[in-house]
Each structure stands twice: as structure tokens, then as C-alpha cells.
Amino acid sequence: MTVTTSTPSGGGAAAVPPEDLVTLTIDGAEISVPKGTLVIRAAEQLGIEIPRFCDHPLLDPAGACRQCIVEVEGQRKPMASCTITCTDGMVVKTQLTSPVAEKAQHGVMELLLINHPLDCPVCDKGGECPLQNQAMSHGQSDSRFEGKKRTYEKPVPISTQVLLDRERCVLCARCTRFSNQVAGDPMIELIERGALQQVGTGEGDPFESYFSGNTIQICPVGALTSAAYRFRSRPFDLISSPSVCEHCSGGCATRTDHRRGKVMRRLAANEPEVNEEWICDKGRFGFRYAQQRDRLTTPLVRNAEGELEPASWPEALQIAAQGLLASRGRTGVLTGGRLTVEDAYAYSKFARVALDTNDIDFRARVHSAEEADFLAAHVAGRGRDLGGSSRTESGGGAGVTYTSLEKAPAVLLVGFEAEEEAPGVFLRLRKAWRKHGQKVFSLATHATRGLEKAGGTLLPAAPGTETEWLDALASGVGLEEGGTQAAEALRAEGAVIVVGERLASVAGGLTSAVRTSAATGARLVWIPRRAGERGAIEAGALPSLLPGGRPATDPRAREEVAALWGLADLPHRYGRDTGEIVEAAARGELQALLVAGVEVADLPDPTRARAALDEAGFVVSLELRPSEVSERADVVLPVAAVAEKPGTFLNWEGRVRFFEAALKPDQMTRRLAPTDARVLQMLADAMDVHLGLPDLRTTRAEIDRLGAWDGPRAGEPLQTASALPRPAAGEAVLAGHRLLLDQGLLQQGDEALAGTRHAARARLSAATAAEAGVKDGDVLAVTGPAGAVELPLQVTEMPDRVVWLPLNSAGSGVASDAGVLPGTLVRIGPATPAGAAPKEVEA
């Protein structure tokens, strides 16, 4: 038989040329496979299952367990089929046809079981254990070993999330190879030698990897277990439901295991085109936010005394309807970036149909009008499942996928830190660097751990200088060695420029990114941080866009949408964005706010946002759990979590990621928890407005009927760079981004996950630290107009008079505590002990 290889992200199958094939015989069956194929893989293609423990298709071969040994004609002894490649004319006999191979496999199994404990009745792996299964299928009924089994103290916590039972380990090295090869975190190793060999960590070196949970899942025995799941359930007691991760924009496939209406664990699903078989720990363990005791289960309304009290759904909906009707045309809608496509579409339609406004925005973060223009021109309506050419006239690319990103010869990251903001993208970049030497360049203040693990090159950029850097890369003029290499690499076929949401804070940054893409021929892709942002664009949850990427000010676009929605026309006025909605509400220009899943601390100016909520005459909050918004709302309506509802996420590729409800709507809360779209439908009915979105199927059908906009696109972003701040001695320009594990609300409820957060540290260059009178390890005070953030200092190679802070980590609420945003000037100096006078910093 001739084997074909498929292109994972589309494009159909490509036949392997005959000169690249070798033909061999396995158990009497002839097969032709590409050169370099392992014997164990060739056997799989014939349907022959060879037992194994150390082998994994996404890890480099190790031959550690020896369970997969087969007989190869011409060889003096059996060989490990996971380490030998197929050669032309090779004849292989597996345990099915070779007594030699069968006896050898029995011997290996007997050896592995000598010290393995009889823990199966209590082991978390029992019922889904490869060792258990293969001991039955390829082992013997008795053992010649009669001595006392070796035991160790158990379990050993190698992190707050991962527990190690050393006596169960079969030394397959899957966990160590994953950590070293895939994640780039060689924090666990096989230590000692011979009979003393075991998995362990270095002294005082905890297993602080964002991907540690994958080692639990790929462990073929119960040696590594989850601290949060240990002894909680048995595999055969669980109901498994396929799902999609709701955290970042990667769209990772997951498997949700639940029991008696409660999610017990979440695993990575096998999705070769997206996350392969890996997910980050945030996606694996970050699901308990929906199981907290403060979960909202019933509507709340504010009574005459100003207190929120429980109410029935009809009562709450009627009060909300009256308040919104009284403010029609003067209501702002803030949806946040975590909604499904269907829910975001419902908000978009509700804003236009029920509230008669284009004042709607999903961007609960730093944003700009330039970004809105960029999204309309280069993102909306483009992507893997949305159409659009793979290369636009401006050089941007709508066809960038995980696979094309992995195959790219060079990648430039701008305003984007892959490991912290899209871990699945980071794993592909690291894999590409390891496998074919992909060149990664990053415009950033310092080389992050993720950049170093991807073999990347830092192009040091102070906040605001990204525009200058991009223009220099486009022209190829005025660059030093690293920049020259990047400019040349970006001109190679298939190169990619990745821009993150943080580039919106740099005036002219996105405009320059488009110019650089056009000048170099590199494809341009935008990767946001949150799961719902890409879908919100297509749903029209922006002041400038209607569903399908239609410009809100285009007459034909409005006519198309109005006709489908049964309206004479839609609002004409260009709507307000998030910042403008907040400001208008704070000034009393808006009378009501409809807020969905937005946390005040995430907004660019939390203080002004609180003022907006206080000044707005009427606030309706759709929420899972109490928040600063719900505490100030007049009506609070509870909604379903991701595990409780079906829906769709659109990942950064533009790939549609459908998922069904893992739980029935009332299983988690014991009360009805409707989707956001269902709540809006009931609210529209109470307002006597026809929304026409009674269920998911109807909503999806309506979105499909609208389709993507085929008319003229919105104009290109045209923004020039602004003047850069000039810090004096004792001052610095603030830089920062959010870490993957921080103070986010969707991470609450899992103490084990919180235990592996990276410590929050401030960063300064050596020269700036000396100028400010601090040294490595000292507590640095970063002071803004609202107050100060105090963190331990880590002296780092980075531009002078720039200070980097994690934006939402413990003790580092930059916007809330200091009242500043990246790109602004702050004062820096040693933290002042309580009761002491502040030090003067000499100019």
C-alpha cells in the first residue's frame, strides 16, 4: 500500500513521490512508507498494535521501556520498534507472528511489574491505564519474583499541581521528554542511575511550567497525578464530553469529564490541526470558577433601600425592560471578550434592534480607533473558515493557521508574548525552532522566557518605538545586526508577522505593521488574548461594524442587515467605543449601561469605569458571579458558563470551533442558567421587541444567512506615531503585559493552579536601577497618579529608563493601584519603609 501525507490545515492530501518511499514487510504484509518512518508507525498503519509505554508520536524516540521490541530478520536480537526506521526490504515480525518477540515482551512486562505496587483499586489511573491493559494483553498470569516490593514515601509534590508516586514509575521518560522537548521546561529529570533511578526535580527547583498538566495525561501509569483530581473519581464513573477551551484565542480542543452534574477534570483532546495533544495548565485546571459558592443562581434587583435582593425572572426582566426602554438610544453595551459567537451576535443585534444604538464594544482592554480600522480592514471576514484570500493586496494574510505558522521560515512578534498570551502558539513556535530552525524575532522590552525557549532574537524596543522599528524593517535602512537579520528573514516566502492586542496602545503601530507586511511580503495575523474576541468581530460587537464585517456606516450594509432583521433601517451614527462609552456614562451623556462579563479592573481606566457605573441612571449586568459591575447594577441576570451551554468560538485563525454543552443548564447551579442570547431574547420580549433568536440553531442559521461582507472594506488604518515620552532621572516609561496565570476571575477556585503562578517582579536595566538607587532583589516602587506598585526588582537587559511590570498579578494591579497604562511616565525608586521619609533621587 502507498501512504499519503496530509496537510493538516487544509489543502488536501499530497502523494509521497516513489523515490521517497521504502517497502518493508511486517507480519507477512507488505507496506510502503515514507523514508524515516519508524517501524512502530508502519505497523500502526497496518492495524498491528505493538505494546509500548515510552513511545509517543509527538516526542522524540527514546527506547526507554523496551516493551515494543520486535524481531527483525538479519539482526541478532530483538529491537525496539519505536527507535528503528524502516528500510527497503526490511522484514519485521511482531509478537503476533514471532515467539521470540512475544517472549521478550513478556519478559519486559514481568520486569516492569517486579516493583510496581498493586495500587489499581485506589490509583487514579485505574480503568484507563496502559500498564494495566497491556499487563493483561501482553503479560503473564504469574511472576517469578517473590521478594518485597520497593517502596518510597508518597506522594511527592513536585509542584502544587503535580504529585509523584515514585514506586509506580516505569521510567518511560515521557514526562521528562515532554518537559524538555515540547514545553522547553527541563525542570524534571531522571535522576540517579540503575535501580535507584527515579523522576525528580532539582533541589529547591519546583516544577513551575505552564504545561505541567500534560505530563499527568501522557504518563502511562499512575506515577504522576493531579493534586486537584486525586482520589476524586474513577474513570468509569465519568461522563466525557468534547469541548473547547474558553480562556485564550487558541481554540484548543478539550475533553470535559463530569460526574453527577459536576466537572471533575479537563483533559487535552487530540486535535492535530490546532493544539495537537497539548493544552496549558490554565485550560486544564481553570474551570472551577463556575463551581464557586458565590455563583449567581437567581436574578437580583435593587430595592427601594438600594440593596440587591433576589427576584423572579419575570420581575427582573420587566424591571430591566422598563429601564432600557426609557434609555433607548442612550445606552452603551459592553460585552467583554469571552462570549461565544452566538452570544456576541445576540448582543450586537439587541443593541441595534432593541436599544437603537451602535454604542457597543467587546474590547474590555486598551484599544484605539486605529485598531478598530485595522480590524475592519484586515481581520473581519477573513480567516480559515471565513473566506478571504491568503494574501491581501496590502500583504496581510487571512490564511495564516497553526500549520502555516509552524512552517514559516521566520516570524516577527509585535505586541505579543506567545507563552503568556496564546500558549498553543508558543508550542508551535518552539516546535518549529527545534525541528527546522525557524527564526523568531520579537519587538519587546526584554527577552522573555518564552522567547528564549523558542530560540528567538530580541529586537529591543522601548514602549512607543514599535512604529519606528516596523518602518525600519519595511525599508531595511538604519538597522543594526539583529534588525538586518529580521528584515531579510521577513522577505522569505511564508514569513509571518504576528501582532497582538497590545499594539493597539502604540499610536501608528498597526498602520506600520500593515506597511511592513506589504513591503516585505510577510503575511500579517492578529492574535488576541481572549477566546471570544475574534468571534465578536464577526458578530458585529464593535461600534464600526455590523455582523459579517459590514461597515456600520455603509448604506448597502445596513440595508442587508436591516432586511434580514425585519427593520426599516439601522442606526446611522458611528458608535462609541469602550473608552468613549465609559466617558459618556461618567459625564451623564448615556443614561444606561448593559454590561456582560466585564471586570472593572480590566478596563483601561478602572477609576473612570467605576464613576461611569455610579453615574449611569440604570445598569443591567449579565454575570456568572458577583463583580464590581454587578455590585453597582440595578438588575443582575445570571447566565450559563461554557460547560453548561453549546456554542461556537472563533479562534485566532478564523477557525470555527463548535462545542456542545457538557452539562445540562441546571446541573452546576441547580437552577436554570440560560445563555446570554436566551436572556437577551427574554429581555427583548419584555420590551415588546422582536429579536428572533429563540435558540442556538436559529441564531447560527441567521449568522450563516448574513455571511461575510462582499462590499468595499473599511479604509486602511492611517495613524502616525505620537511623540515619545522623555523620562528624566527617577522616571521611566511603563511597559508590561499580563502573565498567563494571574489574578483573573476565571482562574479563581483552584488553589493548585494559583500555586504555580510566576512571581510578580519589576524589571529595570542595570543603568536605570543604579540611577534609581536600587539593586537586584530590592523592592522597587513604581508610582503613578493614583498610587504606587511595589515589587521585587529583577535587573534585566532592556532599554534604559523603561520599567516593566506584570499588569494583573498579585500585588501588581497597575491600572487600579497606580492609575497608569503602558506607555506612560511613572516615577521609580526604592520602596519607602513604613513611617520613613521618601528618598530623593538626584537628577
Swiss-Prot record:
Cofactor(s) needed by this chain: [2Fe-2S] cluster; [4Fe-4S] cluster
Binding locations of [4Fe-4S] cluster 1: 116, 120, 123, 129
Source lineage: Bacteria, Bacillati, Actinomycetota, Actinomycetes, Kitasatosporales
Co-factor: note: Binds 1 [2Fe-2S] cluster per subunit. Binds 3 [4Fe-4S] clusters per subunit.
Task performed by this protein: NDH-1 shuttles electrons from NADH, via FMN and iron-sulfur (Fe-S) centers, to quinones in the respiratory chain. Couples the redox reaction to proton translocation (for every two electrons transferred, four hydrogen ions are translocated across the cytoplasmic membrane), and thus conserves the redox energy in a proton gradient.
Protein EC: 7.1.1.-
Organism: Streptomyces coelicolor (strain ATCC BAA-471 / A3(2) / M145)
UniProt: [4Fe-4S] cluster 2 binding residues: 169, 172, 175, 219
One GO CC term, this protein: membrane
InterPro entries linked to this entry: 2Fe-2S_ferredoxin-like_sf (IPR036010), 2Fe-2S_ferredoxin-type (IPR001041), Asp_de-COase-like_dom_sf (IPR009010), MoPterin_dinucl-bd_dom (IPR006657), Mopterin_OxRdtase (IPR006656), Mopterin_OxRdtase_4Fe-4S_dom (IPR006963), NADH_UbQ_OxRdtase_75kDa_su_CS (IPR000283), NADH_UbQ_OxRdtase_ferredoxin (IPR054351)
Domain 4Fe-4S His(Cys)3-ligated-type residues, every copy: 100-139
Gene Ontology annotations of biological process type: ATP synthesis coupled electron transport; respiratory electron transport chain
Enzyme's top EC category: translocase
Entry keyword set: 2Fe-2S, 4Fe-4S, Iron, Iron-sulfur, Metal-binding, NAD, Quinone, Translocase
Name the UniProt record assigns to this protein: NADH-quinone oxidoreductase subunit G
Reaction(s) catalysed by this chain's protein: a quinone + NADH + 5 H(+)(in) = a quinol + NAD(+) + 4 H(+)(out)
4Fe-4S Mo/W bis-MGD-type domain: residues covered: 238-294
A GO molecular-function descriptor: quinone binding
Domain of life: Bacteria
Similarity comment text for this entry: Belongs to the complex I 75 kDa subunit family.
Residue ranges constituting the 2Fe-2S ferredoxin-type domain according to the UniProt record: 20-98
Binding site residues for [2Fe-2S] cluster: 54, 65, 68, 82
Residues that coordinate or bind [4Fe-4S] cluster 3: 245, 248, 252, 280
